[in-house]
Design a protein with these regions (language model features):
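A short helix->loop->beta-strand "cap" motif at the edges of active sites that frequently abuts
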Residues: 22, 149-152
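Generic structural signal for coil-to-beta-strand starts
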Residues: 152-154, 160
Length: 180
């Protein structure tokens, strides 16, 4: 498991009286929770994603590196507009088509697919706690709101400490939450 999630679990176990006290809790990163909610999915490795990106570039006759394409694809999937990333819609479509053909998801698809699945009312939590709230992006914000729709939401963060704007993080999430 993710180191931050493991540390959070350990702190909760210590404060609440052991492993049994937190056994029923869902603790993890957005990606880990979405993976758990999605169930049996084929998640490609970063190496496989790079191979696919390089194939897409080669087949399109475009120049550029697979890593650059993957970075742009990731930013778009995390809420940055394609115009801001310079990502060509044709390349994005070809990359996604290749994933569909393989019946697979990449790391960033976990959030978008998790949100699609959750919109059907699949999962709602009684209590949702989010640490480092200033670093979430729009997709993660939508997940938080969906997961907490029938429960309590508690967020921790500092809008002045947001460092992931390049990945789509939006510290205005605090204001947005307050307005809703």
């Amino acid at each position: 498991p993710n180191q931050a999630a493991a540390e959070m679990r350990a702190r909760l176990e210590q404060r609440l009286g052991g492993k049994r006290a937190v056994a029923a809790m869902t603790i993890g990163t957005f990606h880990a929770i979405c993976l758990k909610l999605l169930g049996d999915v084929r998640l490609i490795s970063p190496g496989e994603a790079l191979t696919i990106a390089e194939q897409v570039l080669r087949e399109s006759g475009r120049k550029g590196g697979g890593k650059t394409l993957l970075q742009s694809v990731s930013r778009v999937k995390n809420g940055v507009s394609p115009e801001d990333t310079g990502l060509d819609a044709e390349l994005y479509g070809a990359y996604q088509a290749r994933l569909r053909d393989l019946g697979a998801l990449d790391f960033d698809d976990l959030l978008t697919e998790g949100l699609k699945r959750d919109v059907t009312g699949l999962r709602c939590f009684r209590h949702v706690l989010v640490d480092e709230f200033q670093d979430i992006n729009d997709i993660q914000y939508q997940l938080v709101r969906s997961w907490s729709r029938s429960g309590e939401l508690f967020v921790i963060g500092d809008p002045d400490q947001s460092i992931y704007g390049f990945r789509g993080a939006d510290c205005r999430c605090f204001q947005r939450l307050q307005e809703e």
